[in-house]
Each structure stands twice: as C-alpha cells, then as structure tokens.
Amino acid sequence: MVKGFIFFRDGEIPFVIEDYRMELFTDDSLLKDFTKEHNFKKNYIIQGQCFGIGSQCQKATFLVEHSIGNTCYLCCYIINRLVEEDEYNTIGLQSPFLDDVFRYRYNYLDMVRAGTNLAVEPKNAYKIPFAMNDRQHDLVFRMGHNNRLGLLEDFDKKGELLIPLQIVEIQECYDISKVFYRLAMFMTSHSEVPFKRITLYKDDRSVGWFYCPLMSNEAASASDVMFYELDVMRFIPKILRNIALDSGNKITKSIPLGHLGNFDSMFSPQRFVEQVMAFEYLFDKLDQKRAQDKRFPLRKELEYMFDEFPQLLLQSKLSSDKVSDQIKEIRRTIAHGHSYYYDFKNDSNTQQLIILLDKLIKNMSLLWIGFSKEEIAEFPIH
C-alpha cells in the first residue's frame, strides 16, 4: 500500500493506493471540487508526494486511466528517489523473461570465460534501434553492475533493458513498458510475463522507480533453454520494430497477442475462439484478396496456411484438410454453445489442435513481420 497526497489547486488531498486504485479522502471541500472537476475524466496526470522512510517525502507522478468519484484508477505512477529529484532520461526494465530471450545466462558464461568481471563493470551485450510513436529509440541490453551506489546496488539484477527517453514523460514510460511486455509475450508464447523492476535513470544514476500492473515482485522464468540457439540480432530487431507499431491498447498494425494464454486458460473455449480471431486477423494481413473472398471460408484459409507450413504437421497423423475441418467444427460447436470448459480440459485431440494453432499463428506472424520461410524454420517455436 502506498500513502501520500496529491496537489490540487492550492491544497493537498491525502490518498492511499492499493492494486493501482487510488482512494482520495479528506473532510476538506477540496475533495468535492476535485471530484466535480475529474469525475469520469480519462487519461490525465496528477502530481503529488509519497511518504517514504520516516518523515521523508518523495515526489510522485500518476497517470490516471479514469476516475469515478473519489477513486482514481491508475495506469502507472512514478516515485522519485527524493522530493526534489524529478529529472530522468532513461528507463531500465528488468525482466526474467527478457533475460531468457536475450540469452543472459549464455552471454554471462561467454563473458566470464573471456575474463570479464561483470561485478566491476557492466557490459552491453546488444544494441538495437527501433521506432515507436514516430520517434527513434535505441535499446541496450546491459549486464553487470556499475558499483556507484555501493551497498545500495541492486545485487539481484541480472540483465537490464535500457532505453533513453525522447520526450521524458510518464506516458512514454508506459508505452515502452507495454511494447517490451508484448515482446516477452510473443517470444515466450505466454500471456503472463511480468517485469521484476523498472528503474528511472539520469546519466546512469538511479533517480526513481516506475510502477504499473505489468510488474510483479514474484516474477520468475526458466525458459532460457528455449533460446539457447536464438540469433538475437537476426530475429529480435524485426520483431521489436513490428510490435512497436502499436503502443496503445488496440492492436491494428502489429502482430496479434490476445490469443496467448496462461496455465489456467491454455485449453479453454474462450482461448480457442481468440486463436481463430488471431488467425483471421493475420490471414487478412497476408492475403487480403482471399480473406475477402466469400468463396474462401475459414476451413479453406486454414488448409491453405497449413500447406504453406507443412513442417507443422510432420508429426501429426492428420492432413491439412482434416485438421482444418476439425478446427472449423470446434468453432461451430462453441458458437452454438455445445462446447464447455471441461470438454477442452479432458480432450487430448482438442488440446493438440490448440497447440498446432499456436504454432501456425506464430509462423504466420513471423511471415508477416518479414522473415522468409527458411528463416522461420530456424526460429525456436515451442
């Protein structure tokens, strides 16, 4: 729980934050004026201070998604290290999932074997340019510590993605965090890939922290073996550039990700429907003429794409037309209310079709990004 107060007009309104929901409270008429001015207001910024250790206050900035009455629902917020400290120019993302994607463990072993001491000086493993919201950015994947803070150094840190900011606003920080969260989603084929910590820097010096719902103190990953042979500089730049086309809540230009699930939703009717929607979205991007042809229904679209990637069915006893017909039939039974959650949980054939659809959607995504079929065959799809 975070406590503090926001500035409004010439006064201060106390608050508490829990689960990114800010509750304002006071007997002063100032709260009434605030609610009158901000009731049902969307996407605005408020400033304030948070209570730190003892009597120390820290400057805070809040991006409000919307507010109802005296409750503000937050997209994210920034807490500066000191009350007068408000300048930052770089955001640093720590993610165990992106550590795996950028091959932290394997790069670490290579650097240590080469005689590099990462406890003394950090090293940049990769530098990747990308564009977001019509602005150019540079991503640096850095490993190690700079030792400037002594015992205050973050010794749990492994790798860190550092992105210099262009307009230095909280919205830019939020957009960047969403883009790299989506990168982790696509690479791991999983919907829950939280950041462990997001730090704000001024010339390599930590000056504050960024908080959003995409974070978790319990974030952990063990998927590094998936990316053992990944050629990072061959695949990640193109994928990142595509994902960064959409930094908002709607995906209209980049690859779809809404069909990805977690452990609980992996095999469910709802996710199956979302997979079909993702497939149709990509098919329209790849072959708009056939997608708009009424004589080319879903079953034919599926068969066409499975024939484009025959390696997906090498270990299956079914042909592309049989698989496509089964997928079409399952979607029909869901639409008519004949399929239920427990049907999916206990049907190994349906589960296999869901796994096949995941692989097909990832292949189609890579094809749309601009990779050749030969390159796609070398991409680690699990």
Q: Positions of the model-derived regions?
A:
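Ampiphathic alpha-helical segments that act as solvent-exposed interaction surfaces
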Residues: 164-192, 226-242
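Intrinsically disordered, low-complexity N-terminal regions enriched in serine/proline/glycine
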Residues: 19, 43, 72, 180, ...
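Long, contiguous, compositionally biased segments that the model treats as domain-scale units
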Residues: 1-183
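Arginine residue identity/basic-tract feature
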Residues: 9, 21, 81, 103-105, ...
